[in-house]
């Protein structure tokens, strides 16, 4: 009888535990004796749910809180930026409306216009400052690092550019025209500084072409590039500069051709001059372009031989080394000086100032072939 009651109670407890939400483990001690035929009943011990969280639980809780704070911060920043941008749009809208009013058919008076422009200027400055603050607030650290790196690169480029300009200036001061390996340097204006030319072919000419490369440092009212003269007439042939103009004289000052505003100081310029006695045709060329022509210039004249040909000075005396005028002297550099008997064609003149200019030589005076002697402080440079 006791055993039947015990089995019935155990079965009833198992069924009750299966149908409940919380499973409780019941321990039945079948070895105990039950007095008076009654099954002892005891209340189950309640679960202690207030246990302390583990370290992993604390870590996950901290991560969740951090993500929540970051999300709230981003949301607040987005709201602030959106509000500021809306304000800026409103400001720009007011500016646009003000500009439309200023440009409308009914323009205000000068005072009102000035006041409105001042207001617009101040508003644009305020908007610019606010936009700058927004950009600073929204800038990320990688962008700041990239900006600093870009600034460093720009600074390096500025220094490189300055160095390049210095090198270019140094090279320009020593640069010679294409095909030319030497030039004659006239360091200053002096009656003792010139170069004498000694052609083998006599200078008895009824027609000629003369070309020369010029880089002048200073030009006065008359600065002689080259001159040929005799004791009887020191002005048989002259090519000289007058400030920014170039002049060709044959047989005397009455036969003079002028080309105005064609010379630039400090730069190489290729000059050519031609003359034909038969028709008195005279022409001047600058860098391959015809700049001046004339007819009836020393028509029928013949340039006599036996004179003195010089570069950088005018010979108006009887003897070498005398009769020079300091104010007529050339200062700068000259190269590629050639004289031909005959008139060159347009194409030949362009070739004379081209890539092989110093390798094209005249049949009366040829640069690099005819003897040219520097005097005073004049000297060859390379």
UniProtKB/Swiss-Prot annotation:
Gene3D superfamilies recorded: 2.60.120.200
Glycosylation: residue positions: 221
Gene Ontology, cellular component aspect: extracellular space
Signal peptide (from-to): 1-17
Subunit record text: Homooctamer; disulfide-linked. Binds to C1q.
SMART domains reported for this sequence: PTX
Localization in the cell: Secreted
Segments forming a coiled coil: 79-137
Gene Ontology molecular functions: complement component C1q complex binding
Gene Ontology BP annotations: innate immune response; negative regulation by host of viral process
Protein name from the UniProt record: Pentraxin-related protein PTX3
Record-linked InterPro entries: ConA-like_dom_sf, Pentaxin_CS, Pentraxin-related, PTX3
Keyword set, alphabetical order: Coiled coil, Disulfide bond, Glycoprotein, Secreted, Signal
Annotated S-S bridges: 180-358, 211-272
Role, per record: Plays a role in the regulation of innate resistance to pathogens, inflammatory reactions, possibly clearance of self-components and female fertility.
Location of the Pentraxin (PTX) domain: 180-382
Top-level lineage group: Eukaryota
Pfam families membership: Pentaxin
